[in-house]
Amino acid sequence: MAILGLGTDIAEIERIEKALGRTGEPFAKRILSEDEVIKFAELKQKGRYLAKRFAVKEAASKALGTGIAKGVTFHDFTVSNDEFGKPILTLSGVAKQIAESMGVNHVHLSISDERHYAVATVIFES
């Protein structure tokens, strides 16, 4: 197995919370997939959740080498968790097509947050 792509992103939670406060749910829906929007609606710390998902999607788009451009959108990435809480990143749409063309067979995701920041790292592996 070889590393085909690596991306890291850090998001300031307060900045995301302010944007969410200004624009509300439309801002969240611009970033989150349908499954993530359902979970988002149930949470108390919405800004923290959104900041972590934003960081993941930016990191994943960097690992693809495209950023959020060239047909790749935030909705092409969905974060869920396995039965142990491990984060799982699922690709769809153009992001999935690009990853397949790169030969990606394994996706690794790490997410962490502290008081002020959320950070994510994504590795695409053959």
Swiss-Prot record:
Its main location: cytoplasm. One of its GO terms (biological process) is fatty acid biosynthetic process. GO terms for molecular function: holo-[acyl-carrier-protein] synthase activity; magnesium ion binding. SUPFAM superfamilies: 4'-phosphopantetheinyl transferase (SSF56214). Mg(2+) binds at D9, E58. It catalyses: apo-[ACP] + CoA = holo-[ACP] + adenosine 3',5'-bisphosphate + H(+). The keyword Magnesium applies. Its EC number is 2.7.8.7. HAMAP family: AcpS. Transfers the 4'-phosphopantetheine moiety from coenzyme A to a Ser of acyl-carrier-protein. This is Holo-[acyl-carrier-protein] synthase. The lineage of its organism: Bacteria, Pseudomonadati, Pseudomonadota, Gammaproteobacteria, Vibrionales.
